[in-house]
Amino acid sequence: METFGDLVAADDVLLFVNAAITATGQREFHASAGEQSLSLDFLHAYMLGNYRDLYAGVLALDVNDHNVVLIVRRLLETSGEATAEQRRREGRLIAARLASLPPPRVYRLFGALRRARVNNRRTRAIMRDWLAARPDPALDAVKYRGAFKAALRHAHLPPAGAELSDFLFSPHARAHYAAPLLETWRRAHHEKAALYDLPYTVAEGFAARQGVPRAVFLERIAPRMTRTETLRLQESALRHGAADVRADLTRMPLTRLASYVLSLPLEDRVRRRAELTGALEAAARRAAGPLRGRWGKVTAVLDDSFSAYGSGVKRRRPLAVALACHHLLGALAEDYTALWTSGRDDALLAFPHGPTPLGRRIIDALDTAPSRLVIVSDGWDNAPPGLAAEVLRVWRTRLDPARRTSVVHLNPVYDSGGFDVRRLSPTVPTAGIRDAEDLAALVELAQFAEGRTGLAELTAYLEERAARLLARTTDDRTTDDRIAHGGRTR
């Protein structure tokens, strides 16, 4: 029998998970960066102080990288408060999750631990194991030289070999390096041709110091760029006349691709309609995987109101999530209907505009008699205010008490004032979402927010996700680093 305390704990964990998925401490449409950070810091301190085991278990869920780093840092800072068994379990989760983070973020975490003087044995062991697992220490030494050197010092680790040690601590002492990448870096100081064999971020500094024209540099460094760098720079490269910098859009992750599409002017989207739509649909099919076409009849209510602009630092992020969810739901469903709050029916030309008439769109969606209704919105229903909550209440309590239609609200925006994502109705489960690729898992998680979920059930779910994470042996996030050293992905 669940106690009242267990029910409160389950609700607290779900609230924190929603925050950890969506919040990044950056400015949102309705809240400043300071408000976001203050709210998020309180939640982390509250969870760590009251539910340490569950707090660590959240690492196994699809929380964003910003909150992964915050969780890891707080767990390592408070190692003395954990039991031996807790430290063992936390260490395994931390190691598994760090392996999935981009290297720059991990190095920034190590730097923060060094500045905070967190240097216990467990911290040094985690740093040692992560550094030992890096596929190419020479690449890290060139690309992240200062951070790499600081991490070795903090963890009391020697570099892997005398040559790497010389490169890190006295790089100009040698007249020649045997490691090809280190030798390329040495030659790039006086040979312009050598810089094009370096990773883009390193070569860019050499090019600026040597006065290489931007267009020439971008044309020649293009084969060394990672997929993300190519996507980010291709429009800038075109403006400089470097036409060879072209990203393979069919290989891009869905949400990142949606952000890129929305960054283009409307006339460019019209001109490239076939290319962009094809790439979005291909990414959606990859994300759907074995669930493709198995969700039955699905209707989505998608928020493209003015608040979907987000903020200057998260420009159009809520709208990008909605656009990506639109294409993913189309791949998951056997029969799919999309209803945008603006009333537009051309998703490719979406842009943030107007109020948020969620209530009216939900009525239209329920008229289609779907087996699943998915609402992707920041929850600021304002045309008229409160209509969505009343529609959902009447639907759930009067018209569909048997729950023939599954309704879930996915919210990409953290509400700092409420310490959670903004909910539309107590009768409908709400989950935070950051990347559309996580949609299926989040719909699964949202079921715990429906009704009064017990702590035992939620704990079992976290343990199952932790087992899945620990069983994973591949590190997908190292691919871009290997590409930067060995060339572009085919």
Give, region by region, the residue ranges found by the protein language model.
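Generic hydrophobic segment detector
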Residues: 48, 55-65, 73-76, 88, ...
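Acidic/polar low-complexity segments with low predicted structural confidence
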Residues: 115-292
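Acidic, glycine-rich A-domain
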Residues: 1-87, 266-476, 480-490
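Alpha-helix capping and helix-coil boundary motifs
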Residues: 12, 101-102, 226, 253
